[in-house]
Amino acid sequence: MANVIVIGAQWGDEGKGKITDLLSRSADVVVRPQGGVNAGHTIVVQGQTFKLHLIPSGILYPETECIIGSGTVIDPKVLLEELGQLKSLNVATDNLFISQTAHITMPYHRLFDQASEQRRGEKKIGTTGRGIGPTYADKSERTGIRVVDLMNPDELQEKLEWTINYKNVILEKLYNLDPLDPKVVIEEYINYADQLRPYVIDSSLKIYEAIQERKNILFEGAQGTLLDLDHGTYPYVTSSNPIAGGACVGSGIGPTVIDRVIGVAKAYTTRVGEGPFPTELHGDIGQQLCDRGAEFGTTTGRRRRCGWFDAVIGRYAVRVNGLDCLAITKLDVLDELAEIKVCTAYELDGQTCHHFPSNASEFARCTPIYETLPGWQQSTENCRSLEDLPKEALDYLKFLAELMEVSIAIVSLGASRDQTIIVEDPIHGPKRALLDENGDPVTTHE
């Protein structure tokens, strides 16, 4: 039995969908703990591409139960569209469950998100405009609509009549937008409720029962460590906690039941939207990474900013998540490069900096300190073991593992399931050793 968290170790879009899909074959339950339709994951199975935002990747395994947890924010319209897409492709969805305490994204959330971002002008954050931040804001202000409210038409009508009238004042007075018609919105969401009702459960209880039955549970994180509300590049972050601790909160379980945490990182670095990005490449190499890596967002279609691998933020991800091992994705994107750079530290105001600065303005002033490695300039897409890899590619992976001080358990060389090298058992492998001041293992946290 193992309860495993899969976490993005960069700014999201690391390939968590594929890694979760791979690991789901041995999972009894897959849980999506946080985030909303701002997160997208792409899975390719036998040449067929599935693009999902809310539904866990494990849905493609008919025997795997999939849970949308209480820490998520759900846009019912998008969720029903995903369910329809899966059903049209003959993918069973009766193994999907939705937490009754997850919050609901409403039309006014989307309007607030888009209008607020527009008013920021040059100081925009770079949100997806899908209403995620305003939904989480209402959750914190205790004025949000939850799934359990959606299931009670009378209670929903009472809450929404008051809430929409209140939100209309903001729409009209602050943003100069047309008000919403409460009757139309209520009718729309009651219709959504009728369609989603069969899926709604007490998710925390179901997860607890699965733990008691010693089932294998996989927690699928959304976004990435550097987008965490508390530990990311604030204010250029998401509105939830994509780190490992957030998976426990968003699932309704305690941290002591987690056996292992797997971090997912690209062999280079990408970022969507605004915010500091020390290793960003603006020239031909950056464009080459974008083109070869098909770096366009699943949710928005926006071009992702591309740069060299940043081991400083990588080590930070290891620290704040307690990563036990790594999955490195898109190694094949680097196949054509004559040389590859890795950021090992920053220069900040004339000083060498080995740690991620919490202040965004300081982070923006960081200049990467690089170490240059030779490229391999041959295809790795058909490699299925470490022995198949060119020596330079293997050396590159070893260098990343040394810098991150954590082992690499999985190497992904393409979008398909079979384009993968399993280096060590990512689920039942050893826990990461605690190191003394000399870098030697002193104990393990069993």
From Swiss-Prot:
Substrate binds at residues 298-304. Belongs to the adenylosuccinate synthetase family. The gene is purA. Its cofactor is Mg(2+). The lineage of its organism: Bacteria, Bacillati, Cyanobacteriota, Cyanophyceae, Oscillatoriophycideae. Mg(2+) binds at residues 13, 40. This is Adenylosuccinate synthetase. GO terms for molecular function: adenylosuccinate synthase activity; GTP binding; magnesium ion binding. GO terms for cellular component: cytoplasm. It catalyses: IMP + L-aspartate + GTP = N(6)-(1,2-dicarboxyethyl)-AMP + GDP + phosphate + 2 H(+). IMP binds at residues 13-16, 38-41, 128, 142, 223, 238, 302. It is found in: Cytoplasm. The active site is at residues 13, 41.
